[in-house]
């Protein structure tokens, strides 16, 4: 090999390194320049504060379901009877399309309160409460039936009614979101 060929290989390698380094610095600079623009798409603090709601449970009678709106979605809040709780806990997991124990769907110590997102998991219709074979919810669009724990028992719905994030602020008040 001649000195000229060795020099070309070294220059090519050196050139590749310089191009790679310059490209990396440019990419990091572009990311830093665009970060404020990307970050502006996140919701502001006042919008995040409105993303949670507080619901007073004291006016909901035993056996009654109330619907509230949270983030544009209907939320079913049900004050279940002892019979509804016992029936939901007696169901065998093998009978469920989407097996989930009743105890997992409610907060410990507040077994009578069931909070679910009121949207059918099949195609997004709003089910009717205290309807159907299982005394839970019935979706009039395609016939999905949910039990008193919001678990799908029959029909085309693949999943149980979703449980939104919520906490008990007191025995008679919850915060959803």
UniProtKB/Swiss-Prot annotation:
EC number of the protein: 7.1.1.8
Superkingdom of the source species: Bacteria
Membrane topology reported for the UniProt record: Single-pass membrane protein
All copies of domain Rieske, residue ranges: 88-175
Pfam families hit by this protein: Rieske, UCR_Fe-S_N
General remark: The Rieske protein is a high potential 2Fe-2S protein.
Protein name: Ubiquinol-cytochrome c reductase iron-sulfur subunit
Species the sequence originates in: Rickettsia prowazekii (strain Madrid E)
